[in-house]
Amino acid sequence: MSKIIGIDLGTTNSAVAVLEGTESKIIANPEGNRTTPSVVSFKNGEIIVGDAAKRQAVTNPDTVISIKSKMGTSEKVAANGKEYTPQEISAMILQYLKGYAEDYLGEKVTKAVITVPAYFNDAQRQATKDAGKIAGLEVERIVNEPTAAALAYGLDKTDKEEKILVFDLGGGTFDVSILELGDGVFDVLATAGDNKLGGDDFDQKIIDFLVAEFKKENGIDLSQDKMALQRLKDAAEKAKKDLSGVTQTQISLPFITAGAAGPLHLEMSLSRAKFDDLTRDLVERTKVPVRQALSDAGLSLSEIDEVILVGGSTRIPAVVEAVKAETGKEPNKSVNPDEVVAMGAAIQGGVITGDVKDVVLLDVTPLSLGIETMGGVFTKLIDRNTTIPTSKSQVFSTAADNQPAVDIHVLQGERPMAADNKTLGRFQLTDIPAAPRGIPQIEVTFDIDKNGIVSVKAKDLGTQKEQHIVIKSNDGLSEEEIERMMKDAEANAEADAKRKEEVDLKNEVDQAIFATEKTIKETEGKGFDTERDAAQAALDELKKAQESGDLDDMKAKLEALNEKAQALAVKMYEQAAAAQQAQAQAGAEGAADTGSTNSGDDVVDGEFTEK
């Protein structure tokens, strides 16, 4: 079975890992970094992903960041003169990760396990699966990020029983999961979270502070200047990271804007104490899901054996202190918070292929599922934190006499009224025989698969007629749209490969011209004019092809030049070798002459007379 890669598709950074033997290994990107910025930019028709895209974010308005926060919505982003869905942008990131994983493995990759925040709803999970499909990946499993982290942490601890709390604060989302580990079973007891809380929010607090201070001093609102705002974002992220290691950092942004008197610069120092003050409300928000998860799991703090920190934002000192204060435990630092989720996803891939044995993952649904009933009430069929996969049925009836059809309004959430919860979909069961209200028996069945994706069935028990749908939210993509996007992605991949081939050829041509010119110069007057003239003629031909830009002609002329340059190089080396041999021979003969002159037979004893 082919390798299944594990992907952590993050808000700010993503990572890809693969199982090698029994160990999960992070695959470094082409720049040598173990995580890749989740940034996509467009320039001159080219799609740029990762570090290169992030570097040009300041100057390139066609740059998309933090697309994960829009997953599962109908919101589109404008770039490159087009509108893209969040699934399409995410697919570009996935395609990039897939590409360098293939380069590392030396084989085609078609399958992946992709992680999502535990608190992602059905629409967001479906959008993630669609993004994988667009990128040419068969998504074998969608795994909750804290669960993946627990897998990576606990794989070598399957012989011991412990309860762990995973605190996952990423770039745009926050999750807390409580798991029980024992005998190779990873059982998620409860999960809670906040999909609108992450490192980006901490950055925004710094940005707002800098904008306010600059406006106070200079009367100019930098938040209205797109380029200045991007520079502020970069500076805020850097300052946040700096303050994890030092107590004060300097923010310096020369020529940030211009005033009536000329250019203006932003120079400001930010202390950790001030940063903690600015972000106090965000840190406080992390405490509620911790308490909620413990309550849902029916556990007290004393029953938690380990606290695992996941996500780059858990490096913020105030966050670490809040975790300590809330749990009464020193967090376990045995895992890398940026890499552990992708590593866990790769382990789950190993479980699917059979390379990892005796490991069972029991995940849960993060939110309750149900339907709207009379009076706009939300009637739950599956409670949150139910182990998945699962199925649950309940019988309902009609609300009016002779009602010919029932509308099934499928919802996800925790509020008592339907209007306050997330609509997943609607469908209708028709042709119900005329009968007084309360008589028809309509059985509604909810199924949640291992990926947390929902399907619903309604069946008239009298006629046995049923209607069945896999939930696709109003914000989801149709199969036709996914198919079109897959073709676009494939075309882009082919175009990217062709572009790379062109660049490689042009670089090769430049290198060949430089090397041949150098060789021709060095061999001037050395006696092999035939080879030099042939190389010069081939060089001139290649230069003409280079000017024309005809790639096929360049390739042919490059091969011809390489042949002539090689012949010239052979002559050079032959001459050098002959000269070296002659020198060595002359040296040997000289040594022999010296030896005969100094032989003992020619030594004459001298007489010495003392006066």
UniProtKB/Swiss-Prot annotation:
Residues 575-592 have a biased composition (Low complexity). The lineage of its organism: Bacteria, Bacillati, Bacillota, Bacilli, Lactobacillales. The keyword Ubl conjugation does not apply. Belongs to the heat shock protein 70 family. PANTHER family: HEAT SHOCK PROTEIN 70KDA. Keywords: ATP-binding, Chaperone, Nucleotide-binding, Phosphoprotein, Stress response. The gene is dnaK. Pfam families: HSP70 (PF00012). It comes from Streptococcus equi subsp. zooepidemicus (strain H70). NCBIfam families: PRK00290.1, prok_dnaK. Residues 575-611 are annotated as: Disordered. Coiled coil: none annotated. Acts as a chaperone. Induction: By stress conditions e.g. heat shock. Signal peptide: none annotated. CDD domains: ASKHA_NBD_HSP70_DnaK-like. SUPFAM superfamilies: Actin-like ATPase domain, Heat shock protein 70kD (HSP70), C-terminal subdomain, Heat shock protein 70kD (HSP70), peptide-binding domain. GO terms for molecular function: ATP binding; ATP-dependent protein folding chaperone; unfolded protein binding. The modification Phosphothreonine is found at residue 173. Residues 602-611 have a biased composition (Acidic residues). This is Chaperone protein DnaK.
